[in-house]
UniProtKB/Swiss-Prot annotation:
Mediates sodium- and chloride-dependent transport of taurine. Can also mediate transport of hypotaurine, beta-alanine and gamma-aminobutyric acid (GABA). One of its GO terms (cellular component) is GABA-ergic synapse. InterPro entries: Na/ntran_symport, Na/ntran_symport_taurine, SNS_sf. It comes from Mus musculus. Residues 1-42 are annotated as: Disordered. Residues 144-215 are extracellular. The gene is Slc6a6. Taurine transport activity is down-regulated upon Ser-322 phosphorylation. Residues 1-49, 566-621 are cytoplasmic. This is Sodium- and chloride-dependent taurine transporter. Belongs to the sodium:neurotransmitter symporter (SNF) (TC 2.A.22) family. SLC6A6 subfamily. Optimum pH is 7.5-8.0 (for taurine transport). Residues 1-18, 29-42 have a biased composition (Basic and acidic residues). PANTHER family: SODIUM- AND CHLORIDE-DEPENDENT TAURINE TRANSPORTER, SODIUM/CHLORIDE DEPENDENT TRANSPORTER. The chain crosses the membrane at residues 50-70, 77-97, 123-143, 216-236, 245-265, 290-310, 332-352, 380-400, 430-450, 465-485, 508-528, 545-565.
Amino acid sequence: MATKEKLQCLKDFHKDILKPSPGKSPGTRPEDEADGKPPQREKWSSKIDFVLSVAGGFVGLGNVWRFPYLCYKNGGGAFLIPYFIFLFGSGLPVFFLEVIIGQYTSEGGITCWEKICPLFSGIGYASIVIVSLLNVYYIVILAWATYYLFHSFQKDLPWAHCNHSWNTPQCMEDTLRRNESHWVSLSTANFTSPVIEFWERNVLSLSSGIDNPGSLKWDLALCLLLVWLVCFFCIWKGVRSTGKVVYFTATFPFAMLLVLLVRGLTLPGAGEGIKFYLYPDISRLGDPQVWIDAGTQIFFSYAICLGAMTSLGSYNKYKYNSYRDCMLLGCLNSGTSFVSGFAIFSILGFMAQEQGVDIADVAESGPGLAFIAYPKAVTMMPLPTFWSILFFIMLLLLGLDSQFVEVEGQITSLVDLYPSFLRKGYRREIFIAILCSISYLLGLTMVTEGGMYVFQLFDYYAASGVCLLWVAFFECFVIAWIYGGDNLYDGIEDMIGYRPGPWMKYSWAVITPALCVGCFVFSLVKYVPLTYNKVYRYPDWAIGLGWGLALSSMLCIPLVIVILLCRTEGPLRVRIKYLITPREPNRWAVEREGATPFHSRVTLMNGALMKPSHVIVETMM
């Protein structure tokens, strides 16, 4: 088919099936207009709404507490080499791919794949399982941050001293630790920090293991409820509310991060901390774990393979130049991660100098940085209350907009599955309330005395890098080798007016799948069972449960393939050919070949069948 004819075919296809009718919101279906139903899908009121929503969605806690630690751990500046390879080879291509197919189809994370390639619609279901599990445990971090924030409004921070009911006789304040004449006569093995005791004995009330859940922590349960209520009211009116909330939640954290950066750089010992953060160790590049960490960090920080970016893109206008903004947002995301390292390690360098220890002894990642290392650091600064409040507000806002953007993506994907039912009246709002309530109840298991063990189990398995790599591989495979990268480029040209450089197309076809397969295999080879604090070993049943969480998403893709092939009658070759067609071919021609047409929820065009340009599909045509 000539290029001009193929492009015209794409334009006609989008005008008839995907493009919104005049005066209607994107995604409004003809049958709903005939019935006099209200518009089914909103659109962003301005471009900045989309930009800030995406920025809020993927600039989150991982940028502040995970990237700097991984950079220090994996060779300092040398870590940037694998990081940028994965960034340009997989992160940006998959990020743009998810946004653009959402914009092109005006559908959420599940139904967009039903339009593009019904046989692989399990990609959308896998994404929704991952993001549903992620939404249950990610918000628990915000509950902890809320708890710390409430306790920060005191003249003396409660984790700075040992005179509280939760402290043990072994508790020793850091002021005594810094008194060398007193400290040399004591054994460090017998004493603990008040910061650690506040975290483990007051916040968590940590039990002996996951098989000993203990009682519910009502203070944390109330904090969790508060955060879920805030999340609900941020998204309950759809993009009309989300697009306005992000004006504050996505911008204010950058201002606070800048303040913390300036403060950190002015502290004594900051230079040593930054040197420790960036000093390159090229020899570390020979360790496969360094490359695994780089790959998984890219997928985590760009919030890809969760369906959220596709859902956000589905609210764009058809002619919106999302390619340009996706590249700018990528620079913002990775730049934030890099700058956060200066803010964090300058303060860790100050801590190390104040305590007279090596920086490696105070460097932490994840909750250890947010709830142990940094709270300890602020107790050593002038005006500790002010810096504590500032830090935990920043954490809350960074995490909150990521949370409600991911929940919005989850809601959009599910509502698009059943639009005729869930978009009537206030059913969408009721559905959001039900979904948030279920997630809250599941999250209560993580605010018990054994909740930290459950939290780590979800974090290690449910939304692991292995799951994300699995989904990313199939996304790129379907677009590049079944739908056709050139065909999608034709659609992109129709939307934004020009074709992106070949880098994206080649990444979808070769580079991203190769990186995903390599990282996936090495992740399985280097796998070690989960432990807590490198001491507590999870029982076998808990490890099995963790793998069950991981497989619950990964198995969606092959299961949907099997189910659809079984539901479609006819020779296997004809069934596969029909199910990989991005629109409904002529019904009579298909039935003549002995296949029963696949009945998707999506209404597809009869007749015109655009022939994909790749060999794998052409051999079946």
